Amino acid sequence: MEVLWMLLVLLVLHLSSLAMSLSTCKAVDMEEVRKRRIEAIRGQILSKLKLDKTPDVDSEKMTVPSEAIFLYNSTLEVIREKATREEEHVGHDQNIQDYYAKQVYRFESITELEDHEFKFKFNASHVRENVGMNSLLHHAELRMYKKQTDKNMDQRMELFWKYQENGTTHSRYLESKYITPVTDDEWMSFDVTKTVNEWLKRAEENEQFGLQPACKCPTPQAKDIDIEGFPALRGDLASLSSKENTKPYLMITSMPAERIDTVTSSRKKRGVGQEYCFGNNGPNCCVKPLYINFRKDLGWKWIHEPKGYEANYCLGNCPYIWSMDTQYSKVLSLYNQNNPGASISPCCVPDVLEPLPIIYYVGRTAKVEQLSNMVVRSCNCS
């Protein structure tokens, strides 16, 4: 009995020490973090350009060809446009949602073949019952099993959303894909996240996709494609006996409703302004500003443009969602015992990185290069 009591005391002390280690962090030396980041960038740039040492040249004394300047500015424009498009398509809360586990659903399609158009009909009410609010939707994919063909011809297929509005049927173009001849059956998929997101806002009982050849020519061979779950276009009914696991279906991943409170709470924290995130004393995992001046910080004269750039870095706490009074504490205790040097909490790491175009000199030759993954735009807990 006394031995059992001693073991219980030791267990309580162990859990207490583990809880303390999870709730406290060492003070961060911001200047040391900055120095390490600068040195890492020095090595990154030289490594990406495959340079053993820095070029011994002063770019300010060189006349840069107009072609190089034009190419550099064009590259900058492309990067900015791409960043703008991605910001529009990906919500600010996407990083938070990506961290949490998703529930996976599979919804089988009711298929119909009409005038060389494959129709995929879904019970939208059933989708709404399972997924819930559109804010919980993470990803939706329309998948179909394409059968092998002996036709040696590429075929471009176009996907449409067929929907009803005010008693009228409308078609909205979504995407097109080139179907190439294959010797084996294979799966084909379309990203329909945006469309399903709209389904969740509507009240229609059924929703439908249509897949049809882009070519309207009368040649039968140009329209010869077989998808499992449909009667073959040649008129036979062989495809009707398709296997259950190869019928067209909609795969959806969504955030379980019980986790939405955590995401909402994180949104509120991230929505209080840049000062909250960019302050060096901010507690959350987010982007910290770091401007690199090539001449001042690295002592380099061989890079002509830009003179410096916003490199940034990630720092801050990540959410720890397990409490010490749950079964997870035992798992974490064992993990910590077997991996004493490893972190048992998520780490704050770069999530979205952008390239950096530069004009630099090797000898008397001006070059324009794009260095990948040099600018940290957002951070995530991983």
Curated annotation (Swiss-Prot):
A single GO molecular function term of this UniProt record: growth factor activity
Region annotation Straightjacket domain: where it falls in the sequence: 22-65
Region (Arm domain) location: 66-263
Domain of life, source organism: Eukaryota
Keywords: Cleavage on pair of basic residues, Disulfide bond, Extracellular matrix, Glycoprotein, Growth factor, Mitogen, Secreted, Signal
One of the Pfam families matching this protein, by short name: TGF_beta
Region (Bowtie tail) residue spans: 218-242
Disulfide links within the chain: 277-286, 285-348, 314-379, 318-381
Glycosylation sites: 73, 123, 166
Signal peptide start-end: 1-21
Gene3D superfamilies: 2.60.120.970, Cystine-knot cytokines
Entry keyword Hydrolase: no
UniProt GO cellular component terms: extracellular space
PTM notes: Transforming growth factor beta-1 proprotein: The precursor proprotein is cleaved in the Golgi apparatus to form Transforming growth factor beta-1 (TGF-beta-1) and Latency-associated peptide (LAP) chains, which remain non-covalently linked, rendering TGF-beta-1 inactive.
An individual GO BP term: transforming growth factor beta receptor signaling pathway
Motif Cell attachment site, chain ranges: 234-236
Family: Belongs to the TGF-beta family.
PANTHER family reported for this sequence: TGF-BETA FAMILY (PTHR11848), TRANSFORMING GROWTH FACTOR BETA-1 PROPROTEIN (PTHR11848:SF125)
Chain's role: Transforming growth factor beta-1 proprotein: Precursor of the Latency-associated peptide (LAP) and Transforming growth factor beta-1 (TGF-beta-1) chains, which constitute the regulatory and active subunit of TGF-beta-1, respectively.
Assembly and binders: Latency-associated peptide: Homodimer; disulfide-linked. Latency-associated peptide: Interacts with Transforming growth factor beta-1 (TGF-beta-1) chain; interaction is non-covalent and maintains (TGF-beta-1) in a latent state; each Latency-associated peptide (LAP) monomer interacts with TGF-beta-1 in the other monomer. Transforming growth factor beta-1: Homodimer; disulfide-linked. Transforming growth factor beta-1: Interacts with TGF-beta receptors (tgfbr1 and tgfbr2), leading to signal transduction.
Name of protein: Transforming growth factor beta-1 proprotein
Species annotation: Xenopus laevis (African clawed frog)
